[in-house]
Amino acid sequence: MMTLDQLKSHIREIPDFPEKGILFRDITTLLKDPNALRESIVHLNRAVYGIPFDYVVAPESRGFIFGMPVAYEMDKGFIPVRKKGKLPAETIAKEYDLEYGKATIEIHKDALKPGDKVVIVDDLLATGGTAKAIKELVESTGATVSKFVFLIELEGLNGKELLGDTPYASVIKY
């Protein structure tokens, strides 16, 4: 079993990416190591164990990497959140603000129904904008968010403030 410090050591730091002054946390080095990948999934699963929920909801693309194995291990369905125009059937959408513009995310209209409970899984909690938009999209169907779970949290950006009163967990904190 890896300690959290050992797991954290598998995340590469890249200064000045994508722009000067940003320290990028690169998970590709964690994904490359089978033990680190396995341990990250174990920690995410622990964060949702015992919580009543029906589905894992996760955004493309890195949310898929971590959300799918959590859904599999917890014997739950997986609902992908995609960028606008990527899902083939009728969708519902949520537009939200980015640092430099706007983005739109979608789920299939029939993916969730009132009373469904979901856990939202993603690789990173930064400003919280994407997580908030996913929560609002889920709630627009009548479903509820039981918990957010993130592999990494950038605490200095205060993303948790946008999660409202929904419980959340993050495995690695910076």
Model-predicted regions and their roles:
Residues D54, D116, S146:
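Conserved acidic residues
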Residues G21, V56, F78, F148:
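Residue-level signature of catalytic and energy-coupling elements of molecular machines
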Residues M1-F53, A103:
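Active-site-facing substrate-recognition patch
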Residues I65-M74, K135:
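Short Gly/Thr/Asp-enriched flexible loops that form oxyanion-binding sites at enzyme active sites
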Residues G77-V118:
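Short, glycine/charge-rich flexible loops or terminal/linker lids adjacent to PRPP-binding catalytic cores
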Residues T3, K132-Y174:
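PRPP-dependent phosphoribosyltransferase catalytic core
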Residues D123, G128:
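Conserved G/P- and acidic residue-centered "switch" motifs that form tight phosphate/ATP-binding loops
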Residues F53-E60:
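Short glycine-rich phosphate-binding loop at a beta-alpha junction
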